[in-house]
Amino acid sequence: MLVWLAEYLVKFYSGFNVFSYLTFRAIVSLLTALFISLWMGPHLIAWLQKLQIGQVVRNDGPESHFSKRGTPTMGGLMILFSITISVLMWAYPSNPYVWCVLFILIGYGIVGFIDDYRKVVRKNTKGLIARWKYFWQSIIALAAAFTMYSIGKDTSATELVVPFFKDIMPQLGLLYVLLAYFVIVGTSNAVNLTDGLDGLAIMPTVFVAAGFALVAWATGNVNFAAYLHIPYLRHAGELVIVCTAIVGAGLGFLWFNTYPAQVFMGDVGSLALGGALGTIAVLLRQEFLLVIMGGVFVVETLSVILQVGSFKLRGQRIFRMAPIHHHYELKGWPEPRVIVRFWIISLMLVLIGLATLKLR
């Protein structure tokens, strides 16, 4: 909203024209979200401790996690607040893509909040009943998917971008809604499954958001979009502001979530961030790129699917415990080693994903 104010004030002082530059607003969006989360962190942690809103740890989990019992959770509130305020300050309020992401971010944040509340108040590790969680995730995702489809119906905004093939971009039609639904819900739950160790989920989220910031900038620039053979989407540029806000808020949260964590993000953070990343990928027409850059989330999810499927079909487990980060813990890896190695893998996957944009 400050952009509109700057457009008015530029008549009196030309220096306010700097607010029209996307790169400038991206930087201050990151810094705004970072400083808000750093300021909010100690206050939120103290408030959560006062209310005794602490993590409920599974009794069948790794023994090293028992010491985490009682650590404040629902820290994702600071992430959501930081992102929302920063985006509202620095993005153009008239941009529909921005509102689609915020709708998912806040909507999934509410679902996650209810889930966390049931866990910490009722001391139930299962939280919100799975079918109700999935129901509300589906309703919110479908509402966003139909809205996004109506915005870009029968244009390049609803084409499927296939990696490595610059001339293959089929028009999806209503299949766009179905694809968007699965990407949003799937990514939300994938990030949620990954959030099992201190800082494990937030840093890959930051890496992927940073990668999408570059993609959004290129997609919103007609010359670079043509150069990379990706669809030019006129609303995509403002998603840079959203992505950098996620980066800033994520880094601010990591300050308190790094091992040993002072606070956990909880489902209010993981479901919301995953949903936001999925929505950004859909809006940029880069669902396949999300699979590559978010490979850590994909592997974590597949490990759970394979573990459950193998046990039901063969009565045997593939991993010592799923998601797969627990498998490595039970193999004797110290928690910080698991975390940092997953971070390194995530960074590599983001760089590989970005490289595929030119391999067409």
From Swiss-Prot:
Pathway: Cell wall biogenesis; peptidoglycan biosynthesis. Its cofactor is Mg(2+). It comes from the Bacteria. It comes from Yersinia pestis bv. Antiqua (strain Angola). Pfam families: Glycos_transf_4 (PF00953), MraY_sig1 (PF10555). It is an enzyme of class 2 (transferase). Keywords: Cell cycle, Cell division, Cell inner membrane, Cell membrane, Cell shape, Cell wall biogenesis/degradation, Magnesium, Membrane, Metal-binding, Peptidoglycan synthesis, Transferase, Transmembrane, Transmembrane helix. The gene is mraY. GO terms for cellular component: plasma membrane. Its EC number is 2.7.8.13. It catalyses: UDP-N-acetyl-alpha-D-muramoyl-L-alanyl-gamma-D-glutamyl-meso-2,6-diaminopimeloyl-D-alanyl-D-alanine + di-trans,octa-cis-undecaprenyl phosphate = di-trans,octa-cis-undecaprenyl diphospho-N-acetyl-alpha-D-muramoyl-L-alanyl-D-glutamyl-meso-2,6-diaminopimeloyl-D-alanyl-D-alanine + UMP. InterPro entries: Glycosyl_transferase_4, PNAcMuramoyl-5peptid_Trfase, PNAcMuramoyl-5peptid_Trfase_CS. The chain crosses the membrane at residues 27-47, 72-92, 94-114, 132-152, 168-188, 199-219, 236-256, 263-283, 288-308, 338-358. This is Phospho-N-acetylmuramoyl-pentapeptide-transferase. GO terms for molecular function: metal ion binding; phospho-N-acetylmuramoyl-pentapeptide-transferase activity; UDP-N-acetylmuramoyl-L-alanyl-D-glutamyl-meso-2,6-diaminopimelyl-D-alanyl-D-alanine:undecaprenyl-phosphate transferase activity. It is found in: Cell inner membrane. Belongs to the glycosyltransferase 4 family. MraY subfamily. Catalyzes the initial step of the lipid cycle reactions in the biosynthesis of the cell wall peptidoglycan: transfers peptidoglycan precursor phospho-MurNAc-pentapeptide from UDP-MurNAc-pentapeptide onto the lipid carrier undecaprenyl phosphate, yielding undecaprenyl-pyrophosphoryl-MurNAc-pentapeptide, known as lipid I. It is a multi-pass membrane protein. GO terms for biological process: cell division; cell wall organization; peptidoglycan biosynthetic process; regulation of cell shape.
